Amino acid sequence: MVKIIECPRDAWQGLSQFVPTEQKKLYLDQLLKVGFDTIDFGSFVSPKAIPQMKDSAEVLNGLDLDNSPSKLLAIVANKRGAEDAAAFEEIDVLGFPFSISEEFQQRNTGSSIDQSFGRVEEIQNICEKTGKTLLIYISMAFGNPYGEAWDPEIAVNWSQRLHAELGIEVFALSDTIGVSDKKPMFLPCRDYLVVVDWKTYQNQCS
């Protein structure tokens, strides 16, 4: 089965001009009619980091969710953001950007990969208590522009550890820099498909 995550959040956060809250709501209401499996609509992170998404809580108010099969996903980067997002009944999925690039993880979340592993544990605990699903975006899954070691096995190995130690079951392989090629990822992922729910996500920021 093919499941599509639509991600207006990723496009919005790259815009310098603020998109009005009501305009975001109108657009999301149209997307909710399409039937996507999940819509990554917003983020609960510091507004200093991503000013465009400072209204994510307001955007939820008044969305027409009754007649849509789509689940709503919000990005979080730490325990506080997870607690804020999990308080909303409308949100089904919390997403955490877990990069296999040390450089990008520091830039994106202000934490090392090892520190981020600890954050994932905290967020997973919150999800389990509140009935949410935690999706891990494996950032830089298809390449690394910083000259660091990269191999498909690195993405798979981190995913295996997140699954085995923390019980994470849903992963999105994220093409952060737009260089995806399914061939190098196929063999490492093939034997692991029976264990976790893999999604592929062509994305420029997560």
Segments predicted by a language model, with ranges:
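Hydrophobic faces of well-ordered beta-strands that scaffold small-molecule active sites
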Residues: V2-D10, D37-F41, S70-V76, D92-F96, ...
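Glycine-rich anion/phosphate-binding loops
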Residues: Q17-K25, L73-E83, N108-I123, A149-N157
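Alpha-helix-loop-beta-strand connector modules within alpha/beta enzyme cores
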Residues: A49-A74, Q115-L135, W158-S159, M185-C205
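Distinct, well-ordered alpha-helical segments
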Residues: Q52-M53, A57, E83-F88, Y146-A155, ...
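Glycine-enriched alpha-helix->loop->beta-strand junction motifs that scaffold or abut catalytic
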Residues: G35, A87-L94, L166-E169, D191-T200
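Glycine-rich, proline-tolerant flexible connector loops at the mouths of alpha/beta enzymes
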Residues: D37-G62, F98-S111, M140-Y146, A172-K183
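N-terminal capping/small domains of soluble enzymes
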Residues: M1-R80
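N-terminal small/glycine-rich loop or linker at the start of catalytic domains
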Residues: M1-S16, F96-N108, K132-Y146
